[in-house]
Amino acid sequence: MIELADNVRLSFNVTFVTHDGGTWAFRDNKRYADVIRYGKIYVGEHTFIGTGVIIMPGVTIGKRCVIGAGAVVTRDIPDNSVAVGVP
C-alpha cells in the first residue's frame, strides 16, 4: 500500500498512514457502515520527506518534491512542489 519511487529520501519519524483507525469509533452505527478510510500512498522520484512528516491515506506526492518537517499531508502534492504545514 506504500510505493516509493527511485531516489526518495526519508528523514526520521516519517509516518505513512494507509488506513484511518478513527472510523472504528462509529463502526457500530449503521448510518456510517460504509465509511472506510484507507488508500495507497505513492511518493514520486527524487523527493525528500522531512522529519516527523505524516502522510495520510490515498495521497500521491509527485516527482522532485520537498515535504517540510512536521507536515501533515492530507491531499495530493503536484510535481516540483515544496509543501509545509498541513498542505
Write out the residue ranges for each language-model feature.
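Flexible, glycine/small-residue-enriched loop-and-beta-strand segment within the central core
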Residues: M1-T60, V86-P87
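Outer-envelope exported proteins of Gram-negative bacteria
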Residues: A5-N7, S11, R64-G70, N80
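Short-chain dehydrogenase/reductase
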Residues: F48, V66, V82-V84
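C-terminal end-helix/capping segment
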Residues: I77, S81-P87
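Beta-rich strand-turn-strand
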Residues: T51-V66, A71-R75
